[in-house]
Design a protein with these regions (language model features):
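Short, conserved phosphate/pyrophosphate- and ester-handling motifs at nucleotide-, phospho-/glycolipid
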Residues: 20, 189, 236
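Hydrophobic positions within alpha-helical transmembrane segments of bacterial inner-membrane proteins
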Residues: 17, 21, 171-172, 213, ...
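Interfacial loop-to-transmembrane junctions
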Residues: 222-247
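Membrane-proximal soluble regions of multi-pass membrane proteins
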Residues: 23-78, 237
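Structural signal for membrane-spanning alpha-helices in multi-pass inner-membrane proteins
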Residues: 24, 28, 90-97, 124-131, ...
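Functional transmembrane core segments of multi-pass inner-membrane proteins
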Residues: 12, 105-109, 113-219, 257-263
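Hydrophobic alpha-helical transmembrane segments
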Residues: 1-18, 90-95, 150-156, 244-263
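Transmembrane helix-loop junctions in multipass membrane proteins, especially transporters and channels
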Residues: 29-37, 95-103, 132, 157-158, ...
Length: 263
């Protein structure tokens, strides 16, 4: 049984790593008006089409020592880190949701809820990378996140109201604040929290916003202290919101229980 669990864990890890590898490609292609679903992956230096042995998550980068097998160009460690993160989050989603809403015959012990959560994590990866590069969040990614939220409501239709409230409880105040303070939040950030709120429900949405503000505030203080930005400069807030969403999704229940007990 232990050997089987280890094998299933490895498969889940590779599934998450493969998804994040693809979403990394999405994050690179979308800002460049390239179709993420068309065309094979190529080496950015020599343009050689990558074969199956070059695309095995994690192991290809390690086996090739971070270099293209054709031209020897260095492959950024970001690719390895993204795939490792995807693997870890796949295990985290399985731990959090298990086989809830199990698939017929099962899928490596993962149910619909765990797979949906992993898909949300993959979308948030692309959102974070694109926002960090361009300070914009593509509408199609927010739409994909909203679809995940709608599916989560369909999986548990009796709990639809907390999800609807979640879509509004943070996004509406963000929008109203923008009416008072020009540029307080980007439009993409507002849509992001509306879509994420539909998936999370209102309690975890508030928690996600809290963590996003804390992380973003700490980064802003660092930029000011290091004199890398002025008081009126803007920076991408999306990555911090995404981090808050993932934390709330995986650990929201225990954190809220601890907070209520503390009160």
């Amino acid at each position: 049984m232990l050997l089987l669990e280890l094998l299933l864990g490895l498969i889940r890890f590779l599934l998450g790593a493969a998804l994040f590898s693809f979403m990394n490609v999405v994050a690179w292609r979308l800002p460049r008006d390239m179709d993420p679903l068309k065309g094979r992956s190529v080496c950015p230096q020599c343009g050689h089409t990558l074969g199956a042995p070059d695309l095995v998550p994690v192991f290809s980068w390690l086996f090739l020592r971070g270099r293209c097998r054709h031209c020897g160009a260095h492959i950024p460690v970001r690719y390895l880190l993204v795939e490792l993160l995807g693997g870890v989050l796949a295990l985290g989603c399985t731990w959090r949701y298990g086989a809830a809403y199990a698939l017929p015959g099962g899928l490596f012990g993962m149910g619909w809820a765990a797979l949906l959560a992993l898909a949300v994590c993959g979308i948030l990866l692309s959102v974070s990378l694109i926002d960090a590069e361009t300070q914009t969040i593509p509408d199609r990614l927010n739409l994909a996140l909203a679809v995940c939220g709608a599916v989560s409501v369909l999986l548990s239709p009796a709990d639809w109201l907390p999800h609807i409230i979640g879509a509004l409880c943070v996004s509406v105040p963000m929008f109203l604040l923008c009416l008072v303070i020009d540029g307080a939040f980007g439009g993409g950030d507002i849509k992001l929290m509306a879509a994420a709120g539909l998936f999370l429900g209102w309690q975890n949405t508030l928690l996600a916003m809290f963590f996003g503000i804390v992380f973003g505030g700490m980064y802003g203080i660092y930029l000011l202290a290091a004199k890398k930005a002025g008081k009126k400069d803007h920076f991408a807030f999306g990555p911090f919101l995404c981090a808050g969403i993932v934390i709330a999704m995986l650990f929201g229940g225990p954190v809220l229980e601890w907070y209520c007990a503390f009160l």
